[in-house]
Amino acid sequence: DDFRKDALATALHVYYINRKYPHAELSLSCPRLRPIVNNDRINPRDVGEKELCQVLCAYRIFLPFAGITVSSRESATFRNGIAKICATKVSAGVSTGIGDHEEKYECKKDDDVGDEQFEINDDRSFGKMYEDMEQGGLQPVLNDYIYV
């Protein structure tokens, strides 16, 4: 019931995994709850942007080797800022509708697509996100490995 305890337990778990499997690539994501269709019980305001920033910065300090992903559930302003501080990955041009991408690529009708799983807060396209990252002084990296 306290997000700080959950964050600490997660960090310790990642630390333990890293000690046991030092060559494993580890990454964290902290998707905050967003309003859910037909669900009034979950309060997405329990963890604000300030608290999320606190958790992500603590992860960066305690787990400097770990990747940190920030989803499109967060606002564009928050994602632009956190990318400069500690995030290593941000999503762009996403869809949360069940079957939504399939509909786009296979010309299915809208009525074949399910409800969105959660609301997106940052709906920037890939191109817009790339442009915003560059304008913010960051170098977007799309691929940081080579297949041999």
Predicted regions and their residues:
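Canonical radical SAM enzyme core domain
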Residues: D1-D6
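Alpha-helical scaffold elements adjacent to nucleotide-binding pockets in ATP/GTP-utilizing enzyme cores
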Residues: A9-H13
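Auxiliary Fe-S-binding modules of radical SAM enzymes
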Residues: L8, N18-V148
